[in-house]
């Protein structure tokens, strides 16, 4: 079958990362960690380490992206080149672009964008250490940062 692997995920009742099958990853959240952001968060979820910052609402640049009746949410999900064992190329790849788009779409539904015409709200997520589940962890960190902004 496609997608199957011979790698053993659980051995002697313990996962590869040392957790029991019914045990969740430990979560640590520290809010307000970035002085220059309107809202920010540092999150550790298992071995994942992620920073998130929210900036705005502010004037939208470039101006051609402005919406006369509402704000736009511009999310950017990036992984540091040193965040994984195999060196990752800096910048946005296809996966990062897709996650950035999904986060933008999700937050436009929960932020009162109609209250801020012609504005922009920027959500930056930086994965500094990745060990599976970074998309969910980054979204959680961004949600905490957004709640503080």
Task: Describe the function of each predicted region.
Residues 119-125:
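Short, conserved phosphate-binding/catalytic loop or strand-edge motifs used
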Residues 2-35, 42-44:
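Short, Gly/Pro- and small/polar-rich lid/capping loops
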Residues 31-33, 38-118:
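Glycine-rich, flexible beta-strand/loop modules in the N-terminal catalytic cores of phosphate-handling
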